[in-house]
Structures are given as C-alpha cells and as structure tokens.
Amino acid sequence: MLTERQLLIFRAIIDHFTWTIQPVGSKNLLKEKGLPYSSATIRNEMGVLEEYGFIEKTHSSSGRVPSEKGYRFYVDYLLQPKKLDKSDRQMIRSFFSENYYEMEGLIQNSALMLSDLTNYTSILLGPEATKNHLSGFRFVPINNFQAMLILITDQGHVDNHLVTIPEGTTLSDIERMVNILNERLVGLSLDDLKVQIPMEVKELLGKHVRNYESFMHVFSDSFAQASQQKVYFGGKTNILNQPEFHDINKVREMLHLMEEEQDVYELFRDIPDGLQVKIGRENNNSLMEDCSIITATYNIAGERVGGIVLLGPTRMEYSRMMGLVDVMSRDLTDVLTKLYRDNQN
C-alpha cells in the first residue's frame, strides 16, 4: 500500500511524536532524522500519507501527527513485539525468581512491576472468583471480643475478616464450629456458598454450638466478599500524568472509574486471548479515547484464569510495551502454574 519511501517517512513521524509529543513538518523531520530525501519530497509524501488518513493536521500547528488509523496500520503491519533489552529482562527474571507462596500477592506485585517498567497504568484481572472452591477456614482469636476469620480457596486466595465474637460464645464453641464448617463446606464453590449455607450444616451447628446463629451473617459476608472479582492495579494514576490528560473533568471521571473495581473488571473481562491492541476510539469508552490499551491473558495449568491490561497514551512505544505485556503473560502463567501444582501436592 505504501512505498518504501513513504514507510520510512511514516515511521519517522511516529518516532518523532512518540518522544516529543509535538507535530512535525518536513523541514524538521529532515533535520531531526537525516532522511535521504529533500524537504520538498518529504512534504509531498506527507501529503500522500495525509490523504490516506495515516497522519493529520492539528489545530495548533502546521505540522502533522499520526492519526488513529495510522497507528492501527503501524501496529498491524509494521512492527512486532520488541525483544526486551537486558535491563527489562533482568528485572522481570529477578522478580519471577523470588519464592511466592500465594497467588494474590504474586498477581498484585506483577501489576506493580509492569507499571514500574512502563510508567503507565497496569491492571491485572484476578481469576474468576465464583469458580473458586473453599479449601479451608481458620478462626484466630485476637482477644475476648474479636477474632480473625481466614477463608482460603483452592486457587490460593486468602480472605481475612476481623469479626466480633458474639457475647456468650466460648473458644470451645468457635473450635467446634470451625471443625464442622471445614468438614462440611470444604470443596463447595463460593458461588453456591454466597447464596446460602446448606441447611444440614446449620442444623448440625445448632446441635453442637451455642449462639451459632450470631455467626451466620459473618460467614455469609465472608463468602460474598470472597466471591467478588479481584482487580489489581499498578500505577493507578500514572496514565493521568500523561500530557494528553489535561481535561480536569476527564481526569476526575477516570479516577472515579479506577476506584470502582467491579466496573473495571466488567470493562475488561472479555478481552480475547493472545496479545491485542486497541487504539483510541476503538475502546468504545469516552474516557479512553486518548488511550491505547494492550491486553493479554494468563493461564494456570492450561486454563485461562485472568487478564493483563496496560493503559497508556496512543503515542506509546508500542513495540516495547507489547513485548513487556507478552513476556509478563508467559512468565506469570509459568509461575502461577508451578504455584498451583505445588499447592496440589
């Protein structure tokens, strides 16, 4: 579609805008990039690129910038994920070589690392919580009035709740109750437990535990919270530090969105498999029309369980960012699978 000369000029325009955030004309492009063409030739070819819709004029300058269509063409046809440089690879390798014993901390730290490497906002979607099954309860008294309720799932998720011990309840009551719950509820899905604790379990508790009804709402709340989808952020406000975000109302709305974890989960829950890029208005969200989003999924033992989202400006360095997300997806899959298998043994 484009000649070799047009491709070279187009790449130079994208490279210029990525690092300067400034429109560029033919004279500056020639001076900055040392292209082997005259200023007039570059200007004519920029006219052709503009006719194709790959670059566009801004309101504030006579120079040109890449358009969304141009970025789409660039991502689809002109680049591959960049092989990571030594410092990026070393940081990721060092991170994943640590010993991790629970999934939640690993995923959260992965989000933080990705944001540190990119200076953008990273979002990791946790495994679908309703598919989790209860693997155990612990009830740890703190004093005569409070205790920590610890819920553990088969996917390694740990949920902690500080609860008030009902008046008249003894430690022996609590111990009997936890034993019954572990015996009867382990293996059931959180999706079922958040709706109702089985009647036969309630009847058994009624026979052996005084004031057991006072605890039922505690367990119901715990199941409901544990079954909520988990979203892990890294650099939550990084995207707002980009020059593109100068509209205070849009900044406020974006911050509000980031605080609503379930809304964020619904926004990205259906991301497709593989490395994907959505640019500007392709995101179908007015808050993200100045953003590009790179996504990938991660697996545990061959089963897709979560997603990786990198949110940055449309002028991002696509080759490096795609490379980072791709490596993160593969390495996180490997480590989570190992953690899962270790927990099964």
Swiss-Prot record:
NCBIfam families: hrcA (TIGR00331)
Protein name, per record: Heat-inducible transcription repressor HrcA
Keywords: Repressor, Stress response, Transcription, Transcription regulation
Gene3D superfamilies the record matches: 3.30.450.40, Heat-inducible transcription repressor hrca homolog, domain 3, Winged helix-like DNA-binding domain superfamily/Winged helix DNA-binding domain
GO process terms (BP): negative regulation of DNA-templated transcription
Top-level lineage group: Bacteria
Similarity comment: Belongs to the HrcA family.
Ranges that cross the membrane: none
Function: Negative regulator of class I heat shock genes (grpE-dnaK-dnaJ and groELS operons). Prevents heat-shock induction of these operons.
Species this chain originates from: Listeria monocytogenes serovar 1/2a (strain ATCC BAA-679 / EGD-e)
GO molecular function per UniProt: DNA binding
